[in-house]
């Protein structure tokens, strides 16, 4: 009679099996590596055959954990049993009947990497999913040919925004999340930052939401300024490089009255700032200045991230807005 396996040993064997069958499936192995993989899989099968009751109980426990806490309708049992172990029911316990991916009338669909809510040491944290959203629901499938979804949730109350803290690899700037107060956050990675922005736009537009400054599409100001923008800035520099400095000196002597409403002059004065503290740029595209220096603000395009584009003494660069203050009280 076989003795019982310790729980931690069973868990380790289960994770090892997941690693061999799922994680290594997408890897290119050498001939020797493939042979070793097959040997380990065979040994795992032999162990499971030697302890059938142990692993049968484990499978039943997993199914029970998947359904705990949510009352499922009788016809939902088969659907729940077919879900991946990493997939879960909607936060609010709602049940969405199975629907084939190709039967949906959608606003946007495509392959994304979905971050698993829970993942083991060996199992991949991100899984490729065919994602589809309609006017009110977001579905995700194993592929675009699947007859039923892996999961679904209502978009009611949800918003979408970029999140560059989810990964540290090449897809760091391709990640976004769908979130709502007191609800589960769903996190995804697209194939490119542009595709992620398209998903965010589509989701926000479908909800009739206008993005606030905090939810505007991500544009990393630490990266180099877009080539076309940079060219536009420096093309104007020869004509205007000395002008802001001259105007600044004049304004120091004769500040504009608060009630001045003279169109362009008023606008120009409003764009003059002075340094609150010394600031040394960490990157070539950042402007360095000292306390009291006069800076002319050209653009507030990166306001969301706390940066503006400024010009000082013929040099143009990014300026942290927290380090400057308006020169005149307009």
From Swiss-Prot:
Residues of the region (Disordered) are 57-84, 236-261
> In terms of domain of life, where is this protein from?
Eukaryota
Q: Mention any Pfam family matching this sequence.
A: SH3_1
Q: Give the Acidic residues compositional bias ranges.
A: 59-68
Location relative to the cell: Cytoplasm
Biased composition, class Polar residues, residue ranges: 251-261
CDD domains xref list: SH3_SKAP2
Q: What sequence ranges are listed for the domain PH?
A: 105-208
- What protein family is recorded? Belongs to the SKAP family.
Q: What is this protein called?
A: Src kinase-associated phosphoprotein 2-B
Please state the gene responsible for encoding this protein: skap2-b
């Amino acid at each position: 009679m076989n003795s019982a396996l310790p729980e931690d040993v069973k868990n380790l064997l289960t994770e090892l099996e997941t690693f061999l069958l799922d994680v290594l499936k997408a890897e290119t192995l050498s001939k020797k590596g493939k042979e070793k993989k097959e040997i380990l899989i065979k040994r795992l099968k032999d162990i499971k055959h030697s302890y059938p009751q142990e692993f049968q109980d484990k499978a039943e426990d997993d199914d029970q954990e998947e359904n705990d806490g949510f009352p499922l309708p009788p016809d939902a049992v088969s659907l729940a049993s077919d879900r991946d172990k990493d997939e879960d029911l909607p936060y609010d316990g709602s049940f969405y009947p199975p629907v084939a991916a190709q039967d949906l009338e959608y606003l946007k669909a495509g392959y994304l990497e979905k971050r698993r809510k829970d993942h083991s040491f060996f199992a991949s944290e991100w899984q490729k999913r065919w994602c589809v959203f309609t006017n009110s629901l977001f579905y995700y499938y194993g592929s675009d040919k699947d007859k039923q979804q892996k999961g679904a949730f209502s978009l009611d109350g949800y918003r979408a925004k970029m999140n560059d803290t989810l990964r540290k690899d090449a897809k760091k700037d391709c990640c976004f999340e769908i979130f709502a107060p007191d609800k589960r956050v769903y996190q995804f990675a697209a194939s490119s930052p542009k595709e992620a922005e398209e998903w965010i736009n589509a989701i926000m537009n479908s909800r009739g939401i206008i993005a606030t400054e905090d939810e505007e599409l991500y544009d990393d100001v630490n990266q180099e300024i877009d080539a076309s923008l940079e060219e536009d800035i420096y093309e104007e520099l020869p004509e205007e490089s000395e002008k802001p400095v001259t105007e600044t000196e004049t304004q120091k002597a004769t500040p504009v009255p608060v009630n001045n409403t003279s169109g362009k002059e008023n606008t120009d004065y409003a764009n003059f700032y002075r340094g609150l503290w010394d600031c040394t740029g960490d990157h070539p595209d950042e402007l360095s200045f000292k306390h009291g220096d006069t800076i002319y603000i050209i653009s507030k395009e990166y306001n969301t991230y706390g940066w503006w584009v400024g010009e000082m003494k013929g040099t143009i660069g990014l300026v942290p807005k927290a380090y400057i203050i308006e020169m005149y009280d307009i």
